[in-house]
Amino acid sequence: MPLPPELLQAVSSPGGGKIALVLGAGCSVEPPTNIPVSSVCSTEIHRCLVADGILQDGECPNPADLSAVADAVFIKRNSQRDVVERLRDQYGLKLATPNDGYWIAAALLFEGVISSVVTLNYDLALSTALSELGAGKIVGVVERPEDLVHQKAINLYYLHRNANAADPELWVLRTAALNLEWKGHWEPIIASKVLAAPVVIFAGLGTPVAVLIESTKLLQAALPAVTKLYLADPGDIARSSFFQALALDASVYIRSEWGELMEALSKRLLEEQIAKLGQAAGRKTQEDNLPNEDIAGLLGALQNMGIVKVGKLRAHWLLYEKPYRIFEENVLGLLADLLLALATMARVSGAEAVIIEDGRVEFRRAGRTVASFIIASGNGYRGKLAVEAEVQKRRTKYSQCPAAALVGGTSASWTTPPTPPTDIVEGEESKNDILRGPTALPLFHIGELRDNHGLIQQVVP
């Protein structure tokens, strides 16, 4: 279903930080994370506990409620270790693979669009996504109340601890433990920092487990009156136990899967980023008296790639040290310059410029690739030697070996050999390797290509 206009405005507003997320077990159900909802996990763990002689049939009044199972085991053994170890190990919580929703959530945290995420889950899928994108210096991860002193401006909070907690007794499975930690540690921070965002979305809350319902009610009670709350769930509103428990108005219910929700949010954000990139290209054309190039197809290709892949593409093109490069106004001119140059090359050569997810650009004619390039910007301060060294270092990471690099945004004068390699698609054979060795890639500056259309026709034959 379409997202509410207020939510679309919040995700695209300048400055960001207007949205906070509260995530439940339903967010980890989608593949490849593939962790079942709490009721399924609880029922299976209860079966194992009975089979292993730790519980007897009937000792737990509700085997589908993980809190009830934990309470039953705690009453018998004064410990919840038997529940925690089975939950952690059977479902691979430490090494959970991020699904698309988690990748997008990590990107939106990194971008500063989402100010905070509070997760009620124990798996580390979202932490893994943040790490893989290189967000460690920007996004704080608060796994326990003791970590609150290390929080950053943007944070991921594990309200119930997570699979990294070495002591199984510290996992918040029972409502008594939740209330103790909430009043003693979480309440002032969550209320003043996390839930102060103008918009809070509860997503994937899933099965109405006692500790989850209690957590959600505590979070709801801490919301400022001006905060707009939404509940996203894939099911029918009449069957949403959390919707009933929170006594919400039907207008705030969003019927959506977790990944679908994040895709819709990120699509609106990316539309804004692409629009600003197009505007930057217009300014660049006017300021430098360049030909009016048609970059609509290239911008459309970026929109179709999605926010995570576009962030990775920015990192490739700007020679960034991390896997993901956030959107910033100060690099728009650099990116626009590269896109305009690609459009010029396509127009002059009569070939189609196709952006590849790994950062390369292929020029195709009649369905055949006639040239393949790395794209590299000096970011306005790197000279030829620095760019060349960085390009050579990165060339082995591409899915297919490019034969040359297109370079822009450099700090000094640039000269390139006038003769391109014999085969612009495959490159030249190394004289030092009986196979095809690491010969230096030719570098072509986009300024030189703009001034010499004959060179364009050579490099895109």
Label every model-predicted segment.
Residues 8-20, 27-36, 75-138, 166-171:
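Metabolite-binding pocket within alpha/beta catalytic cores that recognizes anionic/polar moieties
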Residues 15-68, 129-141, 221:
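Adenosine ribonucleotide-centric catalytic and binding domains
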Residues 134-195:
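Active-site gating loop/helix substructures
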